[in-house]
Amino acid sequence: MITKTLRRTLVSLAALAALGAAGSASAAVYVQCGPGNNGVANDGSIRPAFRTGPSVAGAVECMHLTAGDGFISMADGRTLYSFGFADVTSKAANDVMLDSLAANFAAPTIELQQGKDFYLTLTNVSMAMRPDLFDPHTVHFHGFPQQPPVFDGMPEGSFGVNMGSSVTYYYKLNDPGTYMYHCHQEATEHMQMGMLGNLFVKPAQDAILPNNAPNPLNIPKNLNGKKLAGYVYNDGNASTGYHKAYPLQLGSMDHVFHELHLGVQPLPFKDMKDDYPMINGRGYPDTVNPNPLPAPAEKVDYLTAQNRPAESSQPVNSLITATKGERVLLRMTNLNVTNYYTITAQGLPMQVVGMGARQLKGPTGTELYYETASVTLGGGESAEVLIDTSQVAVGTYFLYTTNLNFLSNFEQDNGGMMTEIVIN
């Protein structure tokens, strides 16, 4: 086991090496966004009007991610070495290669809108703590139905993005639903190390919600006396409407695998056994902390030596809040490489309206939604779950895995894959 003191010593040495190499390093960062590249500012950042999110009014959405390494904190205080993605959409191109140890877990959430053109640039900034590695990286848009094979990311049939390089992926967002994304190069290793993120596409039907917006089908905009915030699918009748939405990515890590990786030792693929279960990259009680978690000391040491600020590696929380009468959407995904997980919500009514980014409907259009007390997801699976709070008592409920051995942070009980649902 690598002690905390030794780990911080390794970080300090890596920081000194990075400073020594900074003057001679050379890389080309090339960002693409829209026809004629009109979404890219002069400094290489993406213009605000083209960035992803609900405020984007145009036909094009763009994002710029980096792939590299970093450190993350477990709920029991342990620090793990990780790989991951970071969002540099607003950064100047010349600053992107300086984004050392910026990997996030979970990766930055990607929120998109049906019908738009999506340009996603990936820049490989290399591994600050493992300069011996020359790993390429990719972004695999998991579940995207019209993905060309060359964008799949598997090394056998498509390309990878090499160190110091940038590649832009293009997608026409024809189908709404809950997806996910991950690196597909050396997938078992890179996914175990943390290259996983939430991704969802909101339906065109959401366009009817603004005041005075055309609504030719007279689709209801309100439920339980409250205006809806959106729909999961183009349902035509508001059956998938919701007031609040939360992405919840299930995952876990094997701390031995991560420590051996940092120690440049052979990796135990055959013996991989995850012992840190998480939701959105955190174990309970960190899941309900509404703030970004502080950066681990190892990351702070490295970036302080370069006179750069250390941002959080785990900004996404999993606290679910609602006002009584609201319908809550849970966009649940599992990108784990070792386990299936079953999730329950302590007796709250759960209705599954979609699986695998597809609305549950029969060939004649009959809705096949179903009520359940739990949802089981294997690696690469997603589900859209609605919880109607209109008949629920005000209070705090727990959403957790029924795999009770995963309600722990390694040897610390009452943690792991659990969060809270607070109904006011």
Regions found by a protein language model. Give the residues of each.
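Copper-binding active sites and cupredoxin-like electron-transfer domains
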Residues: I2, A15, S26-N424
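Bacterial N-terminal signal peptides that target proteins for export
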Residues: I2-V11
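Hydrophobic helical h-region of N-terminal Sec-dependent signal peptides
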Residues: V11-L19
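N-terminal signal peptide c-region/cleavage motif recognized by signal peptidases
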Residues: A22-S24
